[in-house]
Amino acid sequence: TVDGTDVMTLHGKSLRAFRRRIGMIFQSFNLITRTTVIKNVLTAFVPDMPWWRATFGIFTKDEKLKALDSLDKVGILDKAFVRADQLSGGQQQRVALARTLAQNPQIILADEPVASLDPVTAKQVMDDFKRINRDMNITVLINIHHVELALQYASRVVGIRAGEIVY
C-alpha cells in the first residue's frame, strides 16, 4: 500500500496514472547526453503527450515554462541550453532531479543518487533533496550506501543487510 492505494490491484490506465505520481532518480542520471538540458527535462512530459507531439518533440508553452521552473528550483536555469554531456556529474544529477520535478511527483525514489559524485557535490545534491522535501512537501525515499549521509539527512533510516532489516 502506497499513500492509501493498494498497488497490487492496479492495472492498465490506473497503474500508469499511479506511476506518474512517482518520480525516479537513477545513479547513472539516464540523460540524453547529446541534447540540451531543457530537452532532457521536457522528456518528463512525454508519457502524457499524444503520440504525434512526442514523436516530433512538440511541447507546449506551459510545458516549456514548467521545465524552466524545474531547472530554476535546482539552481541550473543558466544551463538550460547547454548540452548535457558538457555538464559535471553534479549538474547532470540536478538535470535528472529537474526532470523528475517537472512531472510534479508526490514521491521521489532515488537510487544511489550520489554514488558517482565527489563528497562536496554529493552534499549539494543531498541538500537539494532535503530542500525539496521540506519546501515542496514531496516524500523522498533514497537508497544509499553512504551511512553518514543517510544519518545526516534522513528523518528515518532503515538499514538492510542480506535482505534483512538490521537497523
Describe each region flagged by the PLM.
Residues 5-6, 49-78:
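Conserved ABC ATPase "signature" region
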Residues 108-111:
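Catalytic Walker B motif of ABC-type/P-loop ATPase nucleotide-binding domains
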Residues 119-121:
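Helix N-cap at the start of a conserved alpha-helix in ABC-type nucleotide-binding domains
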Residues 123-135:
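Helical segment within the ABC ATPase nucleotide-binding domain
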Residues 144-145:
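H-loop/switch region of ABC-family ATPase nucleotide-binding domains
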Residues 104:
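Conserved catalytic motifs of ABC-family nucleotide-binding domains
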Residues 83-87, 91:
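Conserved ABC ATPase signature
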